Amino acid sequence: METRDVIFIDTNVFVKESYFLENNSINKIKELAEDGYVSLLWPEIAFNEVKSHVVRDMLEAFEQVCCKNTRVLRNDEDFQDYCQKGKDVVEGKALKLLENFKSKTNAYIIPNSYCTDVDDVFRKYFDKKKPFGSGKKKDEFPDAFIIQALETYCKKWR
């Protein structure tokens, strides 16, 4: 019986690797998935986090190019037209890159319905257990539900 490793990639890895660059770790994982060596599990919360981040970061980069302080091209009509219409194009490109990655890796999106034990998440929050701790505790709520979705899915199907 053939086995393959099942992996999850946290949002911060996508951000650190600048998402879908040709020679980064994310692309290597995509190649491993395409070749059948790994399967990707992606909780819906994490997928939506990556979607939000990639769109935000690509739009921020676009806005830096089209910033009002860009003196070199600010009087060029074609450039100004591009800057006015380009946001939708950039957002579409970001979403296309994400969907391409999801499709090529044949990632399984774990539905939010696998996040069923809210009491457990709050217990961990008040007891300062992982993923919570001192500091930015409230920022870890998405991670707590991501972990719960992965644990619930694995207990059910593995």
Indicate where each model-derived feature is located.
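Active-site-proximal, substrate-binding regions of enzyme catalytic domains
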Residues: 3-157
